[in-house]
């Protein structure tokens, strides 16, 4: 017991009458050599795996500790020397047998001669009141080796009393809590408070983000009032919010235990620690105890050009619907992030036009200074020969996972220049709005470029230089969602012309409920009830939708319900189905609507039996205890049976977080003249127009036009091929999480999760006067790949866990209208194609010399396709529009 007691002796020293205080942390006796054993081990698995299924490794050694100096004025100030000896590297808990990467390998072969020599060099710790004041080592030692030493040194830092304080150790400047008990002291480190410089980023939207949990507990065991051993465990776990099967866990353990003591060297005399260290060895230098960045070197990896050539075929247009295209896209982004501007630019200039759009997607998505410089050097916005590339660049900017001020500043500079295409100019401003919102979400609202962009958007709406620019600035505000823009939106919504008024109300529709105040709802009520001027149906119905979505009052709901029956025919039916959908789907406003419906004047048969074909419906695509995916479809027709607006939305919810996955709106107006019909009130003088607008992953894109004006309509009808118009097509980096983690053992961990998709959203509108039928189609096709890569690296041995999930899916919406009679026949169909789901997992252990162990697993399933249900009236109507075909076979009544 005496031998154990002298380790980290926690006692009132009796060897010197000059001691003025007592130890508050670990203390050693003089002229003793402490022989300890030390081990650090790490395990990686998929989050719920068993220990034997994990990968990892164990580094063990002997440790010699001696007290070199103690301050004559107090025993709480001491200098100790720590020397690592007898290093061994092996598997951590797993029995690999012949498959072990360490079998037959000596420690010098595994660790490396230079690394091992550096690891064995003694380090010095200056302890003051139990905390490491300075960490001394030799200059120019390998970073990975220094970090292993720091991991051991941090265990010597403790206090004997309970309390919360801040400590600096290998993890950084962290908040720690001590819990002192009779037989142990427990130190809990709050890893989320640690301040340490490490690269990393994540996606702002929580639906696409990563939930992580980190814990660190160090236990100092005490026997008979003396510390005898130190046991530490750190856990890092993560899961992708959107797909929780993409998960991982790192467990890092340390153990330091006394074995024996023997006679040691005399203490070095001196009053100042600096002089003592110089006397011991002048080559010692004070270095930070905080872990330093270990740069991973890729040996034998292909160059950027070689990598591009190996994946190029997967990114050809005809292959983009395959998951392999997205996998190649994600891997190439990782390579681009470590590449120089010149390398990137060289590939851009050498590529052919068929694959260039996909290359532009990847380069822009890399989001590094080098990739931004390269793409801006490559694109010429004054040339009309690269319009497609310019638009792909802008869309990739809009979807940027972690944009910075430099990207926004670059687009602001471009906007001030000249353009070969006005469409591109509009897209630049719209995407500026998207970047403003993302930067503000990341606490960047006061950045110089953001302030400039906000001023540009709001100024453009207050005093537009050109009337046609109003739409552009409204679309930018629809992305930026600036609270200070709401008064301008109300002005345009109430006093603007039809299309501008409608756009302004749709912008208000995207704001959070906290911004839709009573004043805002007063204006929207005036618009809906037409108190000051006549508005188009699209404007009025959108105003009503905003009111009903944002905590409507009793009178708000009552007045809207009382209006049903007094509206134009199709608007009556539309508003009725909106109310029914709120009740059916139990939306927040449903409670207030049920209260109002208790009044007989509101709830009567005449009001709720209005006929028509307009409709609204919301349903679930997927639903689980922690997440839900919903679709909603609302269609508004004119009184003559021609489509006025169709609106298809998909939302993803995780907890309270929300992602507007997609919205495709097809609008048409001024087409009544084609069938000699009478326009509805307020829509007598509308120009013929049809177009499509899309929101994708919370980003409003530039709308596209099918036709504009009667002459354009007739030429399109005469030359129509029925081919769909593409709204957005390309490769998108959707999930992007990267984290460098300094484990307290000294090992370096990396966590990279990426999700990408190849997407093609197209729409078409067919119109036949001969058959008196119109048909609209919206087609969504996607290939999705999510990858995660976790590694733990010591510089000479690495363990890793790679996982991948992939699928190809499709969703098609078709609306068929036969207007040869009234009420006209409408059939809506939403078809979800079958989707294969493939999951892969690879675990590995690898030496820096190249020898490795690999374990692979895969799982496949097929999610069946289906037709998503809409309301019962629609099903009955579809049976009329597309009557069941009689069974084939001889009827017996034919001529032959």
Swiss-Prot record:
It is found in: Endoplasmic reticulum; Golgi apparatus. Keywords: Disulfide bond, Endoplasmic reticulum, Golgi apparatus, Lipid transport, Lipid-binding, Signal, Transport. It comes from the Eukaryota. One of its GO terms (biological process) is phospholipid transport. Residues 28-659 form the Vitellogenin domain. Catalyzes the transport of triglyceride, cholesteryl ester, and phospholipid between phospholipid surfaces. Required for the assembly and secretion of plasma lipoproteins that contain apolipoprotein B. May be involved in regulating cholesteryl ester biosynthesis in cells that produce lipoproteins. Heterodimer; heterodimerizes with the protein disulfide isomerase (P4HB/PDI). Interacts with APOB. Interacts with PRAP1. This is Microsomal triglyceride transfer protein large subunit. It comes from Rattus norvegicus.
């Amino acid at each position: 017991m005496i031998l154990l007691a002298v380790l980290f002796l926690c006692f009132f020293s009796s060897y010197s009458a000059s001691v003025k205080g007592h130890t508050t942390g670990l203390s050693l006796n003089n002229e003793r050599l402490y022989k300890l054993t030390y081990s650090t081990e790490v395990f990686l698995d998929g989050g719920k795996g068993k220990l034997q299924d994990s990968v990892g490794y164990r580094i063990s050694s002997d440790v010699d500790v001696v007290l070199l100096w103690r301050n004559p004025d107090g025993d709480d100030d001491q200098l100790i020397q720590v020397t690592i000896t007898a290093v061994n590297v092996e598997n951590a808990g797993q029995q690999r047998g012949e498959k072990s990467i360490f079998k037959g390998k000596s420690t010098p072969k595994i660790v490396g001669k230079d690394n091992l020599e550096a690891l064995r060099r003694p380090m010095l710790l200056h302890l003051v009141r139990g905390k490491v004041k300075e960490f001394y080592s030799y200059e120019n030692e390998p970073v990975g080796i220094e970090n292993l030493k720091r991991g051991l040194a941090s265990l010597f830092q403790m206090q004997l009393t309970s309390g919360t304080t801040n400590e600096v150790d290998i993890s950084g400047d962290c908040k720690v809590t001590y819990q002192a008990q009779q037989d142990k002291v427990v130190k809990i480190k709050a890893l989320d408070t640690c301040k340490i410089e490490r690269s990393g980023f994540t996606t702002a939207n929580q639906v696409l983000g990563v939930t992580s949990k980190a814990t660190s507990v160090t236990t100092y065991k005490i026997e008979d009032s003396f510390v005898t051993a130190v046991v530490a465990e750190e856990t890092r776990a993560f899961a992708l919010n959107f797909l929780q099967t993409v998960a991982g866990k790192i467990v890092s353990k340390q153990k330091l235990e006394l074995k024996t003591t023997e006679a040691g060297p005399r203490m070095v005399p001196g009053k100042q620690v600096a002089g003592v260290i110089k006397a011991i060895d002048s080559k010692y230098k004070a270095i930070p105890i905080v872990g330093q960045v270990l740069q991973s070197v890729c040996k034998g990896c292909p160059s950027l050009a070689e990598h591009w050539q190996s994946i190029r075929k997967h990114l050809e247009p005809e292959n983009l619907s395959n998951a392999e295209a997205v996998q190649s896209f994600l891997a190439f982004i990782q390579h681009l992030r470590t590449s120089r501007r010149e390398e990137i630019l060289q590939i851009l200039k050498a590529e052919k036009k068929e694959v260039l759009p996909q290359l532009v997607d990847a380069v822009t998505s890399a989001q590094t200074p080098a990739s931004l410089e390269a793409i801006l050097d490559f694109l010429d916005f004054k040339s009309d020969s690269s319009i497609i590339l310019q638009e792909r660049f802008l869309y990739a900017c809009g979807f940027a996972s972690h944009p910075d001020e430099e990207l926004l500043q670059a687009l602001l500079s471009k906007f001030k220049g000249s353009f070969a295409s006005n469409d591109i100019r509009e897209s630049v401003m719209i995407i500026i709005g998207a970047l403003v919102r993302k930067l503000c979400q990341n606490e960047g609202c006061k950045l110089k470029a953001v302030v400039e962009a906000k001023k540009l958007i709001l100024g453009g709406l207050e005093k537009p230089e050109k009337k046609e620019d109003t739409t552009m600035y409204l679309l930018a505000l629809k992305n930026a969602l600036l609270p200070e823009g709401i008064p301008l939106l109300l002005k345009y919504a109430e006093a603007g012309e039809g299309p501008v008024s409608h756009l302004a109300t749709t912008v208000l529709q995207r704001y959070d409920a906290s911004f839709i105040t009573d004043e805002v709802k007063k204006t929207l009520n005036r618009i809906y009830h037409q108190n000051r001027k006549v508005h188009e149906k699209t404007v009025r119905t959108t105003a009503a939708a905003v009111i009903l979505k944002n905590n409507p009052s009793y009178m708000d709901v009552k007045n809207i319900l009382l209006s049903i029956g007094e509206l134009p025919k199709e608007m009556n039916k539309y508003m009725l189905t909106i109310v029914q959908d709120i009740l059916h789907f139990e939306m927040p406003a449903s409670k207030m609507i049920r209260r109002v419906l208790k009044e007989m004047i509101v709830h009567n048969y005449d009001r709720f039996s209005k006929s028509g074909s307009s409709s609204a419906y919301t349903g679930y695509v997927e639903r689980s205890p922690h997440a839900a995916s919903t679709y909603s479809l609302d269609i508004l027709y004119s009184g003559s049976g021609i489509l006025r607006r169709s609106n298809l939305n998909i939302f993803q919810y995780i907890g309270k977080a929300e992602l507007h996955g997609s919205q495709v709106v097809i609008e048409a107006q001024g087409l009544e003249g084609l069938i000699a019909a009478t326009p509805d009130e307020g829509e007598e003088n509308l120009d013929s127009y049809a177009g499509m607008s899309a929101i994708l992953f919370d980003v409003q894109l530039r709308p596209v036009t099918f036709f504009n004006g009667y002459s354009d309509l007739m030429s399109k009808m005469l030359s129509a091929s029925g081919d769909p118009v593409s709204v957005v097509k390309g490769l998108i980096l959707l999930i992007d999480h990267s984290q460098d983690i300094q484990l307290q053992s000294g090992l370096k961990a990396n966590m990279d999760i990426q999700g990408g998709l190849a997407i093609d959203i197209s729409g078409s509108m067919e119109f036949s006067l001969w058959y008196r039928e119109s048909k609209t189609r919206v087609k969504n096709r996607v290939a999705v790949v999510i990858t995660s890569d976790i590694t733990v690296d010591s510089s000479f041995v690495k363990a890793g866990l790679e996982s991948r999930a992939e699928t190809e899916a499709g969703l098609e919406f078709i609306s068929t209208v036969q207007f040869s009679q009234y009420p006209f026949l409408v059939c809506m169909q939403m078809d979800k194609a079958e989707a294969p789901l493939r999951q892969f997992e690879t675990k590995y252990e690898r030496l820096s010399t190249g020898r490795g162990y690999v374990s692979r697993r895969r799982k496949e399933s097929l999610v069946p396709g289906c037709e998503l249900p809409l309301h019962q009236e629609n099903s009955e109507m579809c049976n009329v529009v597309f009557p069941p075909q009689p069974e084939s076979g001889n009827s017996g009544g034919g001529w032959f």
